């Protein structure tokens, strides 16, 4: 099923390029990729560039246009730190589908339901398992490892510690090291519109916005699981 005939991708990481390239190779129009990062040297981005896919580096989507369906988006250039807009110049691009990629989040639901406590990892801005309620370990994506080489290395180390052994089958595996460029984390992207006059959605399916999360914090919620339930962010089929 083709989502749109004029597709645009908005991203802060490399994974959006996989979808853009896949559509392009099937003859489906990819108008552009809007990337909030200044650059990426990963192989998949270089492939997209070699195919002629237009990339707007250090830009953000500030508005969408259309009645009952998407017809255009407006983008503007970001400052170097990503906290403000670099200029008042606006670019309008025709499209009928906007795909978004904000990076991966560890699936920690079962861990927290078992009584486990989370910690926030600053370097990539994710919540990962911290205090375990029983004899268990978390490996792979649920522990915040998303590249295959990291998954194998960290899984091996975790199993060695947990089982008190010196070697695992993982040690004999040979994996090509990923050259994926890190995502850029900006919690609330700047806009040319007044804060409060727009709805900066965090969860499109549940209609949860950044304003809802701020309200939850103002009400005294601190645990991410409490904030989630108060705002419905990430609940239901999002899980």
Residues covered by each model-derived region:
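Residues forming the flavin
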Residues: 1-239
């Amino acid at each position: 099923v083709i989502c749109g005939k004029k597709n645009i991708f908005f991203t802060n990481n490399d994974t959006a390029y996989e979808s853009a390239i896949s559509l392009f190779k099937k003859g489906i129009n990819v108008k552009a990729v809007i990337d909030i990062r200044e650059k990426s040297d990963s192989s998949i981005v270089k492939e997209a560039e070699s195919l002629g896919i237009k990339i707007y580096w250090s830009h953000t989507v500030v508005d969408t246009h259309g009645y009952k369906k998407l017809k255009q988006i407006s983008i503007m250039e970001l400052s170097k730190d990503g906290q403000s807009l670099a200029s008042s110049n606006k670019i309008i691009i025709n499209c009928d589908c906007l795909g978004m990629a904000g990076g991966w989040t560890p699936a920690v639901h079962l861990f927290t339901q078992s009584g486990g406590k989370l910690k926030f990892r600053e370097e990539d801005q994710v919540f990962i398992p911290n205090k375990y309620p029983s004899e268990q370990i978390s490996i792979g994506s649920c522990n915040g490892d998303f590249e295959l080489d990291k998954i194998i290395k960290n899984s091996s180390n975790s199993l060695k510690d947990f089982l008190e052994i010196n070697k695992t089958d993982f040690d004999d595996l040979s994996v090509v090291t990923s050259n994926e460029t890190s995502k850029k984390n900006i919690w609330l992207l700047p806009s040319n519109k007044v804060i409060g006059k727009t709805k900066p959605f965090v969860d499109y399916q549940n209609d949860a916005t950044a304003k809802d999360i701020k309200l939850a914090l103002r009400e005294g919620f601190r645990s991410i699981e409490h904030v989630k339930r108060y705002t419905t962010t990430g609940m239901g089929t999002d899980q």
